Each structure stands twice: as C-alpha cells, then as structure tokens.
C-alpha cells in the first residue's frame, strides 16, 4: 500500500480557503482518492484547546509572541502525530487548512519572530515533515480583511492592524517564490476562475503522482 499525500491550502483571511478546500475534496472524490481533513491550529481535541487559546479575544493577559508561536507548534505537533501521519501511513490523503507556512508568514513575517529560532522549533516538532504540495491563495490584505469583516466576528489575530497583515502578505509571497512545491493562485480573480485554477493544480499533482 502506498502512502498518502498531504495537500495544504494557505492564504490570508478572506482568501477563500474554505471554498477552495471544497474544490479539492470534489477533485479527489472524482479520482476515487480517500482523504481526511485537518485544520491548524486544531484538528485534535487537545490541539483544538490550543486553538482556542491562540484565537480567543477574551484573555485577561496579553499573549507574548513567544507564547503564540509555541502554542501554534504544540498544536501542529499534536495534529501531525495523532492524525496526519497515521492517515498518510494508511494510504489516505490529507487536506490541510494551513500548516507550517502559516507560522512562517504570521509569526515570522507579521510578528517578526527570529527565523533561526523558528527553524529550530520547527525541526524539533515536525522533524523535517513537509506537505507534498501547497496551494497558496494570494490576495491583497485590504481585500481579504474586508471579506473577513463581512463574515462577522473576528478572532484575536484577525483584529490586528493592517500593517501586520501587509507584513504577513509580503512574507507569504517571499516564501512562495522560494519553494517549488508551493503553487500560487490569484485569489482576487472571479471565484469560478480561482476554483478552476485550484482544480487544475490538484489534477496536475494527481497525474504526476500516478506517473511517479
């Protein structure tokens, strides 16, 4: 039995990750590929508790940048060990709503956390594990935040100032340009075109996987 593949959707608030995930699900279903879904932070009972700590606006004390980053990686470590790796070993594919790239963009780019320290934490928790393919939905942060606000209540991170999200966006683009496993999709296009681009990327990946 072959191992499964890990597909990750990345992007800022309002980029359309949920609808893109639905396209990936539909594409995998058409190809008869069994899969599970995950999200970060979260994805297991303990990881979901950590998610609440990270995203809640009700804290009586301010989370330090270090605490935020460590909670993210603690959640990711739990998810990887308890859900992602077992599913891949069982031959299932995994669709991830965010992964390590988010921490690189948000805590690294947005918060300005030291990259060398982040690399060490990532090495300890992920042990070199990487997605097989990442689809990055690229959108101007002004447009994305406008969409997010239209959805309703914002979480602690979504309430950050625009300058923060501009730094996040710049870091996402920088990282995407450096990594051939990251496919950038223009999320400012009409939704139909975005979905077509996502489907095309997934089909191309499936085809290459079958050949390999």
Swiss-Prot record:
Pfam families xrefs: Thymidylate_kin (PF02223)
Keyword ATP-binding: yes
Residues the record lists as binding ATP: 11-18
EC category name: transferase
GO BP terms in the entry: dTDP biosynthetic process; dTTP biosynthetic process; dUDP biosynthetic process
Family to which this protein belongs: Belongs to the thymidylate kinase family.
Protein name: Thymidylate kinase
Organism the protein comes from: Colwellia psychrerythraea (strain 34H / ATCC BAA-681)
């Amino acid at each position: 039995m072959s191992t499964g593949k890990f597909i990750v959707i990345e992007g800022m608030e309002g980029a359309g990750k949920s609808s893109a995930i639905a396209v990936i699900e539909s594409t995998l279903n058409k190809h008869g590929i069994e899969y599970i879904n995950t999200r970060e932070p979260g994805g297991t009972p303990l990881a979901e508790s950590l998610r609440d700590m990270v995203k809640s606006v009700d804290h009586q004390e301010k989370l330090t940048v270090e605490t935020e980053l460590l909670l993210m990686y603690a959640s990711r470590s739990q998810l990887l060990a308890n859900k992602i790796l077992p599913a891949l070993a069982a031959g299932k594919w995994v669709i991830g709503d965010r992964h390590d790239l988010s921490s690189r963009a948000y805590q690294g780019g947005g918060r300005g956390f030291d990259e060398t320290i982040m690399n060490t934490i990532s090495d300890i928790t992920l042990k070199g594990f990487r997605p097989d393919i990442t689809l990055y939905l690229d959108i101007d942060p002004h447009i994305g935040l406008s969409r997010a606000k239209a959805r309703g209540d914002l979480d602690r991170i979504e309430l950050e100032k625009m300058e923060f999200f501009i730094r996040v966006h710049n870091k996402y683009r920088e990282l995407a340009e450096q990594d051939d496993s990251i496919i950038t999709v223009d999320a400012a296009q009409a939704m139909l075109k975005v979905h077509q681009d996502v489907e095309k990327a997934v089909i191309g990946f499936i085809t290459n996987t079958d050949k390999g």
